[in-house]
Amino acid sequence: MSEILTKSRARNVFYGGSLFFIAVFVGLTVQSHNYVVSTTPALTDEVILGKHVWERNSCINCHTLHGEGAYFAPEVGNVMTRWGVLDDPDAAAEMLGGWMDAQPSGVEGRRQMPHFELTDEEKRGLSEFLRWADQMNTQSWPPNDAG
């Protein structure tokens, strides 16, 4: 009869198992937090401004950022690498500003980006936000580098 699971044994199994998995959860949470903090570039005021520009203009309604968002326009999580300006903040701001100023291009039958009335400071902030996003260690996600 000692093989029967009594109420007290069942309670002990439940509490013991619960405590074990809570400890595992807390440990994995701490490990994940430490990993993200150590591999993500630091936020600057320009990056924060760029994130606000990104959100205020609802860029995610057309673009994806690391696979999140709409698939109407190109992925922009790696756009600075594709343009070859990841390591040059001035060239990145100039490239993005020139692209945005040229929109919409007026080419018939092609998806068009609306013209946003952004200041030079906002364009610089947006380029810094996209450079920051491009420098994140996404562990090769999304798998499509073409954008």
From Swiss-Prot:
Gene3D superfamilies: Cytochrome c-like domain. GO terms for molecular function: electron transfer activity; heme binding; metal ion binding. One of its GO terms (cellular component) is plasma membrane. Keywords: Cell membrane, Electron transport, Heme, Iron, Membrane, Metal-binding, Respiratory chain, Signal-anchor, Transmembrane, Transmembrane helix, Transport. The keyword Membrane applies. Heme c binds at residues 59, 62-63. The keyword Iron applies. It is found in: Cell membrane. The chain crosses the membrane at residues 13-29. It is a single-pass membrane protein. InterPro entries: Cyt_c-like_dom (IPR009056), Cyt_c-like_dom_sf (IPR036909). Heterodimer of cytochromes b (large subunit) and c (small subunit). Component of the anaerobic respiratory chain that transforms nitrate to dinitrogen (denitrification). This is Nitric oxide reductase subunit C. It comes from Cereibacter sphaeroides (strain ATCC 17025 / ATH 2.4.3) (Rhodobacter sphaeroides).
